[in-house]
Amino acid sequence: MLEREEIVPNVGDFHCIEYLGAKLLIARGDDEKVRVFANTCRHRGASLKEGSGNCKKFRCPYHFWTYGLDGQLIVAPNFTDSNGEALINDSNKEEYGLAEVESGTWGGFIFVRLGEDTQTLTQHLGSFVDALASHKLEDMRCARKVVYDMDANWKCFIENYVDLYHIPYVHKDSLARWKTTEYHQTKPHGHER
C-alpha cells in the first residue's frame, strides 16, 4: 500500500513520495485515473516535481521535456540529430513516456508493485476484499497521519506489530488481559487480522 487516493483528489493533482527507496510521482489524470510514475525525466533523470500540487502537465526543469498527466511525452524541444532531424517523432514518441509503476486502487488505497509478481491486485488481496467490504474503506478519509522514523528493518517492525502471540508474555503488566486469540488470525495470501 502506497497512499490513500484522497492525496490526489482532483484532476492534475500530484504527490511525490519516496517508497522503499524509489522516488515516485502519484498523479490523477484527465481521465480521473490515479497513476504512479518514477519521478524522473526519461532524458537525463532529473526529478520532475517535489512535494504536492496541481498542474496541467509535467515539465522537466532541465531540458523542458514535457509529459501529460497520463505520462505520455508531449514534446522534447530541439531534440534533433546533427542534420536537424527530430530524434523523437510520432512513430516513436510513446517509447519516451514516463516510466509508469504498476499500480491499482482498492478501497480508497493506492497499491504499487515494484517487483516481479504474476498476481493481480485483486488476486493478491484474495478474501481480504470480501472481509472488509462492509467497512466501506473507499468512503473513509485519513484524519491524521503519523510517521515514525526508526533505525530498524521495517519488515521486522511490522512482523512484531502484527504478532499478537507475544503480548501475554512481553506485555504482562499492561496488555495481558487482552484475549489475543480472539483477534489474531492468519488468512490466505499471508494477510493478518
What are the language-model segments listed below?
Residues K33, G104-T105, F109-R193:
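C-terminal catalytic domain of Rieske-type non-heme iron oxygenases
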Residues M1-E6:
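Extracytoplasmic c-type cytochrome modules immediately beyond a signal peptide or single-pass transmembrane anchor
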Residues V8-E116, Q123-G126:
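Rieske [2Fe-2S] iron-sulfur-binding domain
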